Amino acid sequence: MGECFFVNTPFPFRGIDFFPLSDYTIPDTWRKAHIIWREDGKMVYKWDVTIPKLSGDSPRRAYLWLPEDYEENPDKRYPVMYMFDGHNVFFDEDATYGKSWGMAKFLEENPKDLIIVAVECNHEGNRRLIEYSPMTYTNSEHDTIRGKGGIMLNWMVKELKPYIDETCRTLPDRNHTIIAGSSMGGLMALYGATAYNHVFQRAACLSPSLWVAPGKVLEMVARAHIRRDTTVYMDYGELEMFNHAATQESMISTAHLLLTKRVNLALRIVPGGSHCEASWEKQIPIFMECLGL
């Protein structure tokens, strides 16, 4: 029950290549990564990874947030949340449009027993759409997007997650593994929670791009074996929801199907909300609470 791959792509990778960015020495095997120090001394680690099947040897940035008491409690283990569009998660200076989710600031002000791992997307052309789609579809410019989301999730589940579990003090079981994202990343979070439900018990899907291929999204959810302890948070901003009929229809149909599968679904329309990082930032405390974090 729960072990279903909607896209069962053979996993071709043999390891993650890590590119050191500085000469800092980090405890617990995080060697030679770039440390971003916050005013109160907390840290976000940055390093580069490659995903050969998706982007060859081109590096992309990965981010790791460790809880404030991580070094003080060497026997303590933590849940892990994996996030998409890692460059938009923590810092405005790294964000595509100059505004991030502000996750570092939130966690400094609201400490959580939680490790966060976030990997940057592919910025080249329409590669983000390709890597963050579990299915093939035609976009608004009539381009065919041949989705490689299955390859991306396989990399996360079979390469990135084992590396994090080996090098950090995680709670590696399904009950303590969460996936989150927004827009196309929100679609991927839903994909993770359904097709990879044996790995991810909880998901935060903010403004998920269900509309790109609504029929295929519904098929993805319908075919998945989802355990009844699964929790999914899904929201849309008021401004994006009521201006797009396709978004409304996709949300209602997907929510109905999730409920028929007895998923613990938290569904919200955000008053005044729109499709942007500034809006998603405001939802952090809400989805964290809904997911029991």
Can you annotate each of these PLM segments?
Residues 8-16:
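N-terminal amphipathic/hydrophobic targeting modules at extreme N-termini
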Residues 30-293:
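Non-catalytic cap/lid and distal C-terminal segments of serine-dependent acyl enzymes
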